[in-house]
Regions:
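Conserved catalytic core of sirtuin-type NAD+-dependent deacylases
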Residues: 1-236
């Protein structure tokens, strides 16, 4: 069965996406460390993006975060727009994403569960005041609130747990879906990778450039770029 046939037959599609969905919008996967990286930073990205590092070295955290995690010029790609179109047509019931860029909402998707939070939301750790991304992007050093507290991104760092409400919403959507499209993720990040076990539906589709541990479970496996594949779907 082709992806088009699966989409045509499905009424409750849930899309689960990882970094590979956003790379086509020019957002690099921070795990793909290049040679230049080691000239700029003394620590691996996983260490810099940990809660203990944030607490102990906020200046170094923000130097990395502003340079590598904020991509102000990124725009939604074909995958984001197609998913918004599928939602509008009543076919896609939810997008569950490991990405923190807000591009699904920018493309028009409304029901989006951001497992790892969003760079667009930030808050003061002292008084709780909410800030947009500009407060972080435009700060010269450590972004601070008017009260003097440090502003922290609403992004799930290593050593932090996922937001329980977001997890419950995602699990509920996956459990009710008749089709799950898993895309742009190597399934290496837990607990997010464990979400697929809640899927009880009929069609499990996997789109990823490289093979994943879940390939053998899928009804259809496409080793291609996500935007390339989704852009070909006719919504009808």
């Amino acid at each position: 069965m082709t992806l088009q046939e699966i989409v045509d037959r499905s009424r409750r599609i849930v899309f689960f996406g990882g970094a590979g969905v956003s790379t086509e919008s020019g957002i690099p996967d921070f795990r793909s460390v290049d040679g230049l990286y080691h000239q700029q930073y003394d620590y691996p990205p996983e260490q810099i993006l940990s809660r203990s590092f944030f607490d102990e070295n906020p200046a170094e955290f923000y130097r990395f975060y502003r340079s590598k995690m904020l991509c102000p010029n990124a725009r939604p790609n074909a995958a984001h727009y197609k998913l918004a179109e599928l939602e509008q047509a009543g076919k896609c019931t939810a997008v569950v994403t490991q990405n923190i860029d807000g591009l699904h909402q920018a493309a028009g998707s409304r029901t989006v569960y951001e497992l790892h939070g969003s760079v667009l939301r930030n808050h003061c750790m002292r008084c709780g005041r909410a800030y947009g991304v500009e407060a972080v992007a435009e700060a010269a050093d450590i972004p601070r609130c008017a009260c003097g507290g440090i502003i922290k991104p609403d992004v799930v760092l290593y050593e932090e747990g996922l937001d329980q409400q977001t997890v419950e919403g995602a699990v509920h959507a996956i459990a009710r879906a008749d089709c799950m499209i898993l895309a742009g993720t190597s399934l290496s990040v837990y607990p997010a990778a464990g979400f697929i076990r809640y899927f009880q539906g009929e069609h499990f589709v996997l789109i990823n450039r490289d093979p994943t541990p879940a390939d053998k479970l899928a009804d259809l496996v496409l080793h291609q770029k996500v935007g390339q594949v989704l852009s070909q779907i006719q919504v009808r």
